[in-house]
């Protein structure tokens, strides 16, 4: 708190001086209720502290890049739009009267000046908001005021973005194993015109999900660039050392008569973020040998993002505009999960069995059509009708196979290879020699190399028979001969010699050619038409010649269609000014999951790739190109399935907002929104849910139903209900019908504000708002059955709600201000996974599974204070024109409170009440909120030259340590010293060790220490069309761990783990050391 007190004192003194200067000046709070449809190309360098009757917290899902009733080739809003797009110059010319409570707007100009490249950089110099870290799949949304991910809204151009599968059951079962890309998609920063961050309940703008706040993005438009000209061209190159990312961005904007177009194409190519001590391993071999949770270096990934934004507009006159937009982006991550917990440690560096190769993708494609009308009517000044179709796919693909030459599946110690000499194929060893057979060596003879060494264990001396192996003529020239090894001739006599044989070419049904070499037959039949055949073979290596690739390909799909109508109108009524916005939309979203598991071949060697099986079936051999030369099936497909039934969400919305200016010093914000959310579950037989997850779910099997075991073992007086029986299918159908129940949620959102301007240097704002989050489809409908962890659906869940109360005091002069803000957020009906106890899997059965269910359980409260300030030194001293100071601060506290004892603790406390009575106090105390950030301060000192040709900014971020009492370990009951029950048997368990210390309570295991990070960024504009930007980040090379990275460390699963007992592997989660960024941009 020392830094805070000092900073507050300094700011108070500065603004007291500032306020006295302002107070002595002439009053500027003149009425502004003049007609608003005047030409807008007037000078804009007027003082910004004039009272205005503009909305201060209206819904922001309105288009903000529209013309202001003027032709698009006029110089309207020149100052405002240039300020957002250009890089040079001051980046925070804020109109205090338009600044909203708990809201921050970040412009494209500011993002470019700070060299922002992703969502982390977006909030890098903000307080009270951070990104949610997930490890390999990157960031997943934001954490604001104690809640995160789906409880913080994200919108792009009026469309909600994909939500995660937020069911705690899903996270427990699947998320910790890296098989799903269960993250919220991000946006390409180069496409962003403005990003609006709202802290506090915000369902008015974002609808369901904005409990703690929202982040709303608006993308760029051609009219942002075509201010006083008809074309714009920009090419930007950038590089950053923390992940070796190369940036290429091409921007084209043009206008011809009634048409305008914008194209922004961006490519980012880099690798994983380099943690502190990234070069800890001396060489590549040591790096690859460092595997499992103890690995201290970030896993190697290649990360690319390709994004294209195209907007085409047609404006036949000043009153009508048609436009179409395409926003298409793909984020791809390829690499190796070296820290994967199930990787075989003993084979690291000398790989025999395999490793985990990943290929994750996050794809987003949005097509939008819109019509705008600017004709003034009694009902609107501007109307916009738009249709959007957005498809988002988050894919996680993992391939587990061995791709080294030392792999068991491709082992070839003798280096056998295929050579062609004089039109003859020969198999020779690594020295180019043929192997020979010495029948006098060993017990039964043996194959030897030229040096007389035994090679029997390295070659397949019993397989490769000529009648079972066929040659792929697409790969080898079947006009050649092939040298084969003959053990016995057609008379059954020993031979042990090589012979050259002709290849007989034949054709497969698909038209492809293959070759075969027939075995010679003796002249005298053994019996009937059976003759003695020679024993001849290809001498292949003993291994299969390929590695089996176990593929998990899993997609989470979110497809949204939306039609929206927005209207706005400004008018005077009696002696009050009104700025009215109203409208509504209809939105339909389909959420689905597709799991595709199959096995294929990888690391294929010559003896597997050039030959295939002549399969013996019913006494006859048939060519089988899908089978290896050993007649084993190489590719198997387990098919597609899902653990979540497809659910269509329909959302009907109406909203109304009015900013009322009662007097020159008193204004009201009155905003309302109505949401009606319907969930319509369905079932796709082509992508089924495993039958066992649904049968017996609601409607149990009867006591006389025989379900398990072979139907042939069914007792005489029982009904056959084994898998795929009519009884089993009927139970599945009945339970599916009960599961597919429709659910709906209705919510009335409001945002009420009071704006007071008692003087021309003080503004007081009050805000009271609410928000809601309808349960996600997986929280309602997900089902799972397993002897150790089962999930029961719950179609009776209530929506989560939140209420925000805020008061803000702003002292200002011109562009200088300080805002002191106090807030309280109250949350209700938190959805959490609750243990509902063991339940029989069928009626009358003694077999019971431990079932869990999502239920409304928790309530929470978060309180805090925030400070946001900026001082333009030129407002105090003329000689310091261009210098500016900034300070941001957030302090917040919160707890989750139960209405009673959490049911999941009931059995644990009962078992341990005698030896460990202290556990009950731990279980009953309010639970800390891990999504609350530690106390954070950001200082900014900068200078922009009057010529705006160069400037520099220094940011100092100070983050307090996360206190142990403010952190929570959800697995504490399985880590403390305890008595536990396993399969009905009670046993004593010793406490786990975390980082060398015994776990004794529910405090989080990994927390950040206090740290201070300094960044310095500068720009230089030597000529009008050229801008250089460069920065040094973490200037002092501080080693630090962020709280969001610390809380992402898992205690269960196979990814994002460390060795809990010792803390080995923690270094992998540390932030980068000193790193650099630079960019150059050409503009014409």
Curated annotation (Swiss-Prot):
Residues 228-1084 form the TBDR beta-barrel domain. InterPro entries: Plug_dom, Plug_dom_sf, PT, TonB-dep_rcpt-like, TonB-dep_rcpt_b-brl, TonB_rcpt_b-brl_sf, TonB_rcpt_CS. Residues 26-73 are annotated as: 12 X 4 AA tandem repeats of Q-P-T-N. It holds the Pfam family PT. Transmembrane segments: none annotated. Residues 26-77 are annotated as: Disordered. Residues 95-220 form the TBDR plug domain. Sequence repeats lie at residues 26-29, 30-33, 34-37, 38-41, 42-45, 46-49, 50-53, 54-57, 58-61, 62-65, 66-69, 70-73. The keyword Kinase does not apply. The keyword Cell wall biogenesis/degradation does not apply. One of its GO terms (molecular function) is siderophore uptake transmembrane transporter activity. It comes from the Bacteria. Residues 26-75 have a biased composition (Low complexity). Gene3D superfamilies: TonB-dependent receptor, beta-barrel domain, TonB-dependent receptor, plug domain. Its main location: membrane. SUPFAM superfamilies: Porins (SSF56935). It is a multi-pass membrane protein. GO terms for biological process: siderophore transmembrane transport. Residues 1-24 form the signal peptide. A motif (TonB C-terminal box) lies at residues 1067-1084. This protein is subject to phase-variable expression associated with alteration in the length of the CCAA repeat region. This mechanism is called slipped-strand mispairing. Addition or loss of CCAA repeat units would change the reading frame and result in introduction of stop codons downstream of the repeat region. This may be a mechanism of regulation and a way to avoid the immunological response of the host. Acts as a receptor for hemoglobin or the hemoglobin/haptoglobin complex of the human host and is required for heme uptake. This is Probable hemoglobin and hemoglobin-haptoglobin-binding protein 3. It comes from Haemophilus influenzae (strain ATCC 51907 / DSM 11121 / KW20 / Rd). The lineage of its organism: Bacteria, Pseudomonadati, Pseudomonadota, Gammaproteobacteria, Pasteurellales.
